[in-house]
């Protein structure tokens, strides 16, 4: 089975978090519905932005430990290029129990849901809002939860963007190390070491400090500890790469795996990629990026997400980047990135946008960046080499 790596250079226009900025300053207000929804395994806090449109999926997000939907995703969704996408979709943000802003402490003896149970809470969320399907975006623990949800309910998931996903159970040595570090290390330090790589903690001091302060000042420490314990007690997802003539458990929907090249989750994401269907999976490694690409590289992630969504048949009229236009003007085809690869990510159907009321706009934030083609290799007609797993390094 052959594999191809496509190197695409995308320059980030500007850092999302400037010196002196705080998390609060990054959180743009939207007209939203917020509800605490009762499910099979307790209550979950949900924020719905926009109005769902007919049979169109919503974008459903799930955050990592030490975060909630605001600190994990608002910086990305407030970014101009991402708003081009969210004009087309309602967005449903799910906060793990007790992780939302102002969450009350759980009573003594409260049994926090397992990771499997957190995934089992999501059908109740969709039912509450009358939603039929989602495009999921999960980070870390949230990526695991959405993957489990997709395995259990494939008919409800049209696609997944998985940032820093780890499909494996916590190893015994990792479990022991986390227990020992819990005795000697403050909870914020444990979370920071999960979110950021060592290199990033030295080079991105301001961002790391901002998130450390969020953990200290805004998160309920008891509730956070319960969520961390649930994540560290997760089961192996037991997924396998499908082989002809065999029945295997794996994702049925398209998946975009995202990881920064200096993220502590690199090995886990590569492992996950090896277990998924190569005709439906793209691995996106971001150069000069740490553990939170949605924070430090929003332009790259928004660009990747746009073409991923287009590959599912949406956003046919999305604007072209300057590099894409320059290639067209010079007679250079997008497929030059991968000779025979077909552009299935641009054969879209029609749809409308609901998250924000924006019309056409200029692509100022990507005018200096490069076009990213993330169409997975799916064995185009005439190609007898078999399926290829695609990796994109940017």
Swiss-Prot record:
Belongs to the NDRG family. It comes from Homo sapiens (Human). GO terms for molecular function: cadherin binding; gamma-tubulin binding; microtubule binding; nickel cation binding; small GTPase binding. Ubiquitous; expressed most prominently in placental membranes and prostate, kidney, small intestine, and ovary tissues. Also expressed in heart, brain, skeletal muscle, lung, liver and pancreas. Low levels in peripheral blood leukocytes and in tissues of the immune system. Expressed mainly in epithelial cells. Also found in Schwann cells of peripheral neurons. Reduced expression in adenocarcinomas compared to normal tissues. In colon, prostate and placental membranes, the cells that border the lumen show the highest expression. This is Protein NDRG1. Keywords: Acetylation, Cell membrane, Charcot-Marie-Tooth disease, Cytoplasm, Cytoskeleton, Membrane, Microtubule, Neurodegeneration, Neuropathy, Nucleus, Phosphoprotein, Repeat. The modification Phosphothreonine is found at residues 328, 335, 340, 346, 356, 366, 375. The modification Phosphoserine is found at residues 2, 319, 326, 330, 332-333, 336, 342, 352, 362, 364. Under stress conditions, phosphorylated in the C-terminal on many serine and threonine residues. Phosphorylated in vitro by PKA. Phosphorylation enhanced by increased intracellular cAMP levels. Homocysteine induces dephosphorylation. Phosphorylation by SGK1 is cell cycle dependent. Interacts with RAB4A (membrane-bound form); the interaction involves NDRG1 in vesicular recycling of CDH1. InterPro entries: AB_hydrolase_fold, NDRG. Residues 325-394 are annotated as: Disordered. Residues 327-339 have a biased composition (Polar residues). SUPFAM superfamilies: alpha/beta-Hydrolases (SSF53474). The modification N-acetylserine is found at residue 2. Transmembrane segments: none annotated. Sequence repeats lie at residues 339-348, 349-358, 359-368. It is linked to Charcot-Marie-Tooth disease, demyelinating, type 4D: A recessive demyelinating form of Charcot-Marie-Tooth disease, a disorder of the peripheral nervous system, characterized by progressive weakness and atrophy, initially of the peroneal muscles and later of the distal muscles of the arms. Charcot-Marie-Tooth disease is classified in two main groups on the basis of electrophysiologic properties and histopathology: primary peripheral demyelinating neuropathies (designated CMT1 when they are dominantly inherited) and primary peripheral axonal neuropathies (CMT2). Residues 339-368 are annotated as: 3 X 10 AA tandem repeats of G-T-R-S-R-S-H-T-S-E. Induction: By homocysteine, 2-mercaptoethanol, tunicamycin in endothelial cells. Induced approximately 20-fold during in vitro differentiation of the colon carcinoma cell lines HT-29-D4 and Caco-2. Induced by oxidative stress in colon cancers. Decreased expression in colon adenomas and adenocarcinomas. Induced by nickel compounds in all tested cell lines. The primary signal for its induction is an elevation of free intracellular calcium ion caused by nickel ion exposure. Okadaic acid, a serine/threonine phosphatase inhibitor, induced its expression more rapidly and more efficiently than nickel.
